[in-house]
């Protein structure tokens, strides 16, 4: 018998989808958490507990999954890019918008005009929308500063968001996102003057959990990203990469050679790149919001990824220009409908594999003893409903680190 205390919470009368490979739904399930950590997940018949002093929550037969993980966002920014949306409707491509001075650079001015506190306030409505759909963990990238201070302010805002909302924030340093106008044609100088010293400062301030980059014809070359990743390696910071979104430069293969946590987008990934990712354990992060928003026609090679044994995560890619999306539930539906991911691939892609893509699978992403008690409790009969519905939020309540934080 487990001795209970007021620090123990017990969820009874539940059905549990643990998101563990090969595991089935546990009916008539019980979840026990102590001091925010899971101590039991399984059938009620397998547990004996003295619950006189514990808080017991009757789930009414609802389905419980791990709290969702959005593993790729640019959610901290100022302004919007609705005008570019109109440009694309009139026929301009993503590359044409970027080469005309729009795209990422156009968000920089609006973002750098805000203080850290103002960035937090601007981002909260977007963050709150994701949390309302069961998200417990959120990755946030810099990339709209393009100066040392601008990049670090975005990361400071990301850290601050974790203090004002019940959410786990994982940060990525993305100074190698674009070059500002004053460095046009001088990528090497920008890397030397901004990217590398900014990484040093961010690392010293404990603002950086991973280093990211945009490897593409309109951004940085493979060799330029190697320079950035070599510096991250010296500092002991994990890396990840936006790769093969608009063309195949071999970025995913290069990232895999550094043991990258993930390579993201991947519409133009080839078999060689997929095999390199599989060998390195690099997760493929699929981003249907960007594919949809820029009216892309080339889909990521899902079957090639499956055949190679690459694990797949999905994410919103929430950003002001190419994926103004704040619904991980809709992202699941897009992944299934546009890219033919299975229900299991979608749900595990927004939980287990998303946590793996952030390097935090030991903390969250599945419902297993020892992990954080991050739960999403749903008013649904079967898991497929999370993927099947469009524009409907069936969340009943959210639990973060063992505490109910929203209904």
Curated annotation (Swiss-Prot):
<dbReference type="GO" id="GO:0019557">
    <property type="term" value="P:L-histidine catabolic process to glutamate and formate"/>
</dbReference>
<keyword id="KW-0862">Zinc</keyword>
<dbReference type="GO" id="GO:0005506">
    <property type="term" value="F:iron ion binding"/>
</dbReference>
<comment type="pathway">
    <text>Amino-acid degradation; L-histidine degradation into L-glutamate; N-formimidoyl-L-glutamate from L-histidine: step 3/3.</text>
</comment>
<feature type="binding site">
    <location>
        <position position="319"/>
    </location>
    <ligand>
        <name>N-formimidoyl-L-glutamate</name>
    </ligand>
</feature>
<feature type="binding site">
    <location>
        <position position="144"/>
    </location>
    <ligand>
        <name>N-formimidoyl-L-glutamate</name>
    </ligand>
</feature>
<keyword id="KW-0963">Cytoplasm</keyword>
<dbReference type="GO" id="GO:0019556">
    <property type="term" value="P:L-histidine catabolic process to glutamate and formamide"/>
</dbReference>
<feature type="binding site">
    <location>
        <position position="317"/>
    </location>
    <ligand>
        <name>Fe(3+)</name>
    </ligand>
</feature>
<keyword id="KW-0479">Metal-binding</keyword>
<feature type="binding site">
    <location>
        <position position="242"/>
    </location>
    <ligand>
        <name>Fe(3+)</name>
    </ligand>
</feature>
<comment type="similarity">
    <text>Belongs to the metallo-dependent hydrolases superfamily. HutI family.</text>
</comment>
<feature type="binding site">
    <location>
        <position position="242"/>
    </location>
    <ligand>
        <name>Zn(2+)</name>
    </ligand>
</feature>
<keyword id="KW-0408">Iron</keyword>
<dbReference type="GO" id="GO:0005737">
    <property type="term" value="C:cytoplasm"/>
</dbReference>
<feature type="binding site">
    <location>
        <position position="74"/>
    </location>
    <ligand>
        <name>Zn(2+)</name>
    </ligand>
</feature>
<dbReference type="InterPro" id="IPR006680">
    <property type="entry name" value="Amidohydro-rel"/>
</dbReference>
<dbReference type="Pfam" id="PF01979">
    <property type="entry name" value="Amidohydro_1"/>
</dbReference>
<keyword id="KW-0614">Plasmid</keyword>
<feature type="binding site">
    <location>
        <position position="81"/>
    </location>
    <ligand>
        <name>4-imidazolone-5-propanoate</name>
    </ligand>
</feature>
<comment type="function">
    <text>Catalyzes the hydrolytic cleavage of the carbon-nitrogen bond in imidazolone-5-propanoate to yield N-formimidoyl-L-glutamate. It is the third step in the universal histidine degradation pathway.</text>
</comment>
<feature type="binding site">
    <location>
        <position position="144"/>
    </location>
    <ligand>
        <name>4-imidazolone-5-propanoate</name>
    </ligand>
</feature>
<keyword id="KW-0378">Hydrolase</keyword>
<feature type="binding site">
    <location>
        <position position="321"/>
    </location>
    <ligand>
        <name>N-formimidoyl-L-glutamate</name>
    </ligand>
</feature>
<dbReference type="GO" id="GO:0050480">
    <property type="term" value="F:imidazolonepropionase activity"/>
</dbReference>
<feature type="binding site">
    <location>
        <position position="322"/>
    </location>
    <ligand>
        <name>4-imidazolone-5-propanoate</name>
    </ligand>
</feature>
<dbReference type="GO" id="GO:0008270">
    <property type="term" value="F:zinc ion binding"/>
</dbReference>
<dbReference type="InterPro" id="IPR032466">
    <property type="entry name" value="Metal_Hydrolase"/>
</dbReference>
<feature type="binding site">
    <location>
        <position position="74"/>
    </location>
    <ligand>
        <name>Fe(3+)</name>
    </ligand>
</feature>
<dbReference type="InterPro" id="IPR005920">
    <property type="entry name" value="HutI"/>
</dbReference>
<keyword id="KW-0369">Histidine metabolism</keyword>
<feature type="binding site">
    <location>
        <position position="177"/>
    </location>
    <ligand>
        <name>4-imidazolone-5-propanoate</name>
    </ligand>
</feature>
<feature type="binding site">
    <location>
        <position position="245"/>
    </location>
    <ligand>
        <name>4-imidazolone-5-propanoate</name>
    </ligand>
</feature>
<feature type="binding site">
    <location>
        <position position="72"/>
    </location>
    <ligand>
        <name>Fe(3+)</name>
    </ligand>
</feature>
<protein>
    <recommendedName>
        <fullName>Imidazolonepropionase</fullName>
        <ecNumber>3.5.2.7</ecNumber>
    </recommendedName>
</protein>
<feature type="binding site">
    <location>
        <position position="317"/>
    </location>
    <ligand>
        <name>Zn(2+)</name>
    </ligand>
</feature>
<feature type="binding site">
    <location>
        <position position="72"/>
    </location>
    <ligand>
        <name>Zn(2+)</name>
    </ligand>
</feature>
<dbReference type="InterPro" id="IPR011059">
    <property type="entry name" value="Metal-dep_hydrolase_composite"/>
</dbReference>
